[in-house]
Amino acid sequence: MKVILNEDVKYLGEEGDIKNVAKGYARNYLFPRNLAVPCNEFTLAHFESRKEEIEAKKAAKRQDAAGLKEKLEALSIKILMPAGPNGKLYGAVTTQTLFDELQKLNFDIERKRIEILGQTVKSTGVHKAIVKLYENTSAEISFTVEAQIAEEKPVKASEKKGRRPRRDEEASDEQILAEENSVTEEAVSEEIQNSESEN
């Protein structure tokens, strides 16, 4: 059925737009919330009388979109991602990634309005995306993807498992063994001498 929107409805249209929607959607959602009215000669006449007012609101939106476009295109966005030595990312930069970055910069833009040229980004470097703002106004933003280098933690001595002893450690062990053998030989020799003297 045809309806006229009383105000802007997300994903549907703007105030004054005539839309063809399912009857259930109109009766169960739009009409109870006063978001739309049935399209007939009376409602058409009413919105015709408000045409200038509605057009003034749209003109203000166009102006806001132009200002937002300028701000977005002046941005310098840097995204750090885990990557290999050849610059290939271990993951990918998606529209969700850009949406999160814009949120951090206090830009409240719907994710569905962001479009990455090439769908996703899987390498470091400078890339571009389109942000659809209002009507035919879009912003082209550039963003740089850089490799995120993980810091190596120093390995503690207690964490070194299965480590082969150093040469100086090996020499020390051999020296201790030789000294122990020498002491044992001296003790045996002394015991033999005592036994002979008793005989």
From Swiss-Prot:
Domain of life of the native organism: Bacteria
GO cellular component labels: ribonucleoprotein complex; ribosome
InterPro entries tied to this protein: Ribosomal_bL9, Ribosomal_bL9/RNase_H1_N, Ribosomal_bL9_bac/chp, Ribosomal_bL9_C, Ribosomal_bL9_C_sf, Ribosomal_bL9_N, Ribosomal_bL9_N_sf
Keywords attached to this entry: Ribonucleoprotein, Ribosomal protein, RNA-binding, rRNA-binding
Protein's name in the database: Large ribosomal subunit protein bL9
Signal peptide: none
Transmembrane segments: none
Main function: Binds to the 23S rRNA.
Entries under PANTHER family matching the protein: 50S RIBOSOMAL PROTEIN L9
Region ranges (Disordered): 153-199
One GO BP annotation of this record: translation
Organism: Treponema denticola (strain ATCC 35405 / DSM 14222 / CIP 103919 / JCM 8153 / KCTC 15104)
Record-linked Gene3D superfamilies: Ribosomal protein L9, C-terminal domain, Ribosomal protein L9, N-terminal domain
